[in-house]
Design a protein with these regions (language model features):
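Single conserved hydrophobic/aromatic residue that forms the stacking wall/gate
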Residues: 240-251
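A generic, well-ordered mixed alpha/beta core segment in the N-terminal half of proteins
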Residues: 70, 74-133
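Acidic/polar, glycine-rich intrinsically disordered N-terminal extensions of enzymes
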Residues: 1-48
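Flexible, glycine/charged-enriched surface loops at secondary-structure junctions
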Residues: 24-31, 43-48, 62, 103-116, ...
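Conserved mixed alpha/beta catalytic, RNA-binding, or beta-rich assembly cores of soluble enzyme
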Residues: 142-208
Length: 251
C-alpha cells in the first residue's frame, strides 16, 4: 500500500492549472507550426501568424494563451493500492484549482449556482472524472475547457441501425453550424457508444489524446480520416478529429 499526502495532489493540481493555461502541449505547437507552413490562404497565413505570436507572448510574459481560462476539467486515475492521507482528496483538488487560478492570475468564471449567477471567486468547483486502476500509481490531467468551444458541443442519440456515413455527416453538420464560434483552428473530439453521459465523456476524453496519434483501431482511424477530409472542405481550419469508441477510450 502506497501512501500519498493530499497536499501533494493540491500542489500538482495548482501547477497544472497554471501550466495548461499558459503553454500548449508540444504536439499541439508542432501541429500549429506545420499547418502554418502549409496554409495557402493569405488570410489563413495571417491568422496562423497571430496564433504563433500569441503563443510566444504567453510563454515569454507568463500570461494566459486566451482570456477565457475555462472550467477546470480534471481526469484522475487512482491505483487501487493507493491510500491518501492528510485530509480530504476532494478538498485538496478544489484547493489546488483555487490556488492555480488565483495565484496564476487566471480569470475566474465559475458560479456557485447556475441561476443565481454568483461567482465563486476562485474558479471552483472543477469537473472531476475519477478512474480506479490496478497498482500504486496516480495520474492527473488538467484540461481547462473554455465555453466558446464548449457551447458548440452537441450530442445526438442515434439508432443502432445508423451507418458510419450518417455519423460522419452529422459530425460535419455540427462543425458547419459552429463555424467560427469555437475559434478555429479547432480540435474535434467525437464519442461513439455508451449512454448519454458516457458518450459526452468519451468526446471530452478524446481531446486529451496527442494530435500526432490516431485511433489504434483501423476502422476508427479510417473514420477519423474521413471526418478530417470532409470537415476541411468546409473551409474552417481543422487540426484533428478524434472519434473514441467506448471499448478503446483509454488508448
Amino acid at each position: 500500500m502506497r501512501e500519498i499526502n493530499v497536499s501533494e495532489v493540491e500542489e500538482l493540481v495548482r501547477d497544472l492549472c497554471i501550466k495548461a493555461n499558459l503553454y500548449l502541449p508540444e504536439d499541439m505547437e508542432s501541429c500549429i507550426e506545420c499547418n502554418a507552413r502549409e496554409e495557402q490562404s493569405p488570410v489563413g497565413k495571417n491568422v496562423f501568424a497571430d496564433i504563433l505570436d500569441n503563443m510566444r507572448v504567453a510563454r515569454e510574459e507568463t500570461i494566459p494563451i486566451c482570456q477565457d481560462t475555462g472550467m477546470a476539467v480534471i481526469f484522475m486515475t487512482i491505483g487501487q493500492d493507493v491510500h491518501f492521507v492528510g485530509g480530504s482528496l476532494n478538498e485538496a483538488i478544489n484547493k489546488g484549482v483555487a490556488r492555480g487560478y488565483t495565484e496564476g492570475r487566471l480569470r475566474c468564471s465559475i458560479v456557485s449556482d447556475p441561476l443565481e449567477r454568483v461567482n465563486t471567486g476562485d474558479n471552483t468547483p472543477p469537473v472531476v472524472h475519477l478512474k480506479i486502476a490496478e497498482g500504486e500509481k496516480v495520474e492527473i490531467m488538467v484540461a481547462p475547457k473554455g465555453f466558446g468551444s464548449e457551447n458548440m458541443s452537441q450530442l445526438k442519440m442515434m439508432t443502432p441501425s445508423v451507418t458510419e456515413d450518417e455519423i460522419v455527416d452529422w459530425v460535419v453538420s455540427v462543425c458547419a453550424k459552429a463555424g467560427s464560434n469555437p475559434c478555429p483552428p479547432i480540435v474535434i473530439g467525437v464519442g461513439i457508444g455508451g449512454d448519454f453521459e458516457k458518450c459526452a465523456y468519451l468526446a471530452k476524453k478524446a481531446l486529451c489524446r496527442s494530435v500526432s496519434k490516431r485511433n489504434p483501431k483501423e476502422r476508427y482511424a479510417k473514420l477519423e480520416a474521413k471526418m478530417l477530409e470532409k470537415i476541411n472542405l468546409l473551409g474552417i481550419c481543422l487540426l484533428y478529429t478524434s472519434p473514441s469508441p467506448r471499448d478503446v477510450e483509454e488508448s
